[in-house]
């Protein structure tokens, strides 16, 4: 998914009550120096039923891989006992991990909104799910 590898993502929000993690690549505006059409929208990566997060706050381009085998030992119980999915997040040559029920990736043009605050919001398009 080339859209994820060419953008900067930030941990945008996390809610303990719903174990919901939002990672966002924020849209840019035409008056910004480095604007182009590929930045005309936010890209939100929403992880639900999150039980483990190992990420820096800023990621320069990402690749998300669901690990089905060769799972690091420290995550075996999450997978075997609880049925969670293990996601490896690759960014700038490093690997990070999120253990969660699933994820969804959506595009939107929300300015001061997100699905942490309003779960009824609908993305303009969904570009990935686990």
List where the protein language model places each region:
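Surface-exposed, interaction-prone regions used to assemble/regulate multi-protein complexes
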Residues: 1-130
């Amino acid at each position: 998914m080339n859209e994820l590898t060419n953008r900067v993502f930030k941990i945008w929000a996390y809610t303990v009550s719903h174990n919901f993690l939002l990672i966002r690549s924020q849209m840019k505006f035409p008056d910004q120096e480095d604007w182009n059409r590929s930045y005309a929208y936010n890209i939100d990566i929403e992880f639900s039923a999150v039980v483990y997060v190992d990420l820096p706050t800023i990621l320069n381009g990402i690749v998300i891989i669901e690990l089905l085998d060769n799972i690091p030992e420290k995550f075996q119980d999450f997978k075997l006992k609880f049925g969670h999915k293990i996601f490896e997040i690759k960014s700038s040559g490093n690997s990070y991990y999120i253990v969660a029920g699933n994820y969804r990736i959506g595009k939107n043009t929300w300015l001061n909104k997100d699905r942490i605050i309003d779960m009824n919001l609908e993305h303009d398009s969904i570009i990935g799910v686990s």
